[in-house]
Amino acid sequence: MKIIPFSKLTSIINKGDVIALAALSTANLPAEILKTLVEYNDEDQSFTDFTFMLANDISDYRGDSYDLDAFTTRGMIKRLITSIITASPATINAMRNNEIEAYYLPQGVITTHYRSKTQESPGTISKIGLNTNVDPRYTGGKVNERTTEDLVSLIEINHQTYLQYDFPDIDIALLRGTYADMDGNIYMTHEAHLGEGYSLALATHNNRGKVIVQVKAVVQNGNFNPNDVFIPGKLVDYVVVNTNPKLHRQVMQTQYDPALSGHYQITEMREPYIELGTRKVILRRAAQFLLEGDVISIGFGINNELSNVLSEEQVNHLVQPNIDTGVFGGLISSREHFGMNYNLSARMRHDMTWDFIYNNGLDVAYLSFAEVDQMGNVNVSKFGEKMNGCGGFIDISQTVKTIVFSGAMVVGGQLSYENNKVTVEAQGRATKFVDKVGSMDFNAENAIKFNQEVYFVTERAVFELTHKGLKLIEIAPGLDLEQDILANMAFRPILSDDIKLTQSDIYQAHWGGLAQAIKSDYRI
């Protein structure tokens, strides 16, 4: 391991390199390394044709940092392989305009494939992604017309069908830790999550690439417990020491919060409780599907505020909420800090989290939907002007026992919640229950085949997936079935013989009924 100044990086990284990072937004983001590369390119425009490989988007949501958009707008990226983009609008535009090659592939597959690289395996072979948009019988994960090379192929082993993911070898791993010792061992002491940096370092080292780690400081050997080593020094080629704290923030809005790295626990949520409205009503109804002891996965979108509802109802101790980034239990942060937990009970490597998920570790997954069709197929990745990608949606939805899809039934609708009922003030645009989904991210036929329980919770009605398609099983009190629900769908769902009314107490400002629901013997 060599400790080098940032200026030396430009002699190590070359035009056309395959560069991989293990960051989530600004967490674990080696921003000062990225700044160095961007500024060097600004001088002579020689740092181009990079392939970037990321499990998550890297952005601080402000548009003025050294992140994915900074590289895209300068024409530095030739190809992007990722699972999700939520806050890099310039990169989305570049993909839409065919300015770069791009792939959206399952986050768990991207994260765990680094181990395949270390084992000299013929790519990653998995059933994850079969019969979805990443299957080559659909798009193979290709985002636009400029993207032509197949990274995913269909193969058969012992009369069973699999997908084979063939990722490029990694030339450069750009990682971040809190400290390095004189032997190059990396410690994640102040980081909010561990990420997949260890596996990425292994894969890069195996390819004779270079592993570069940005840290806050280099310390003498023996300062830390050897059990706390995250990346052994033998895997690290270069260490650079941060000179500007703003380019080494723990998370987006916080330089360093010890509670986010598990060093102490907070007494209550640091985010205000959600006001009574459509989001809160949906989340309350969705939470009623929980049972005591459930291990749950909370996805991006509306569900990232589910932990807020659990906390307000004082039921956090009855279930274990998890995020697929590797943080288990506790209070899940929402919005810009989504992916970080307060009061976490365990912290695992990102790739190990997918081992847990793939091996039936979850009981219930709370996922969002953008479009759903009559058969119950779901699109989350590409709709309207949005093309955010699948994230871990495909990995989770193909492995969990029970799925609760949550979302508003219409776009722009206005509802009021008074006297324990719902009143529609404005219907909104019916764009979510469609004839055909724009991207096959969840294949309902697969779910039926593997006996998954699947529900769709909206502010107006609740649906259940059956082998014949979507069945309406519940409507909100005060609504007209034809005018307020069916008129906002492009198809007519199966109607239950016993359509129930949603429990009216969830429309009160203060509820207090979730604990009783969770302690019941069945999902309601």
Segments the model singles out, each with a brief description of its role:
Residues K2-S11, S25-E43, M53-A70, M76-T267, ...:
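Conserved phosphate- and dinucleotide-binding cores of soluble alpha/beta proteins
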Residues K127-I128, S297, E305-L344:
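Anionic-ligand anchoring segments at beta-strand to alpha-helix junctions in alpha/beta enzyme folds, i.e.
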Residues N41-S46, E313-V315:
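Short helix-capping segments at alpha-helix termini
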Residues I282-N308:
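Active-site pocket-lining segments that scaffold enzyme catalytic pockets across diverse folds
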Residues H263-T278:
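Glycine-rich phosphate-binding "P-loop"
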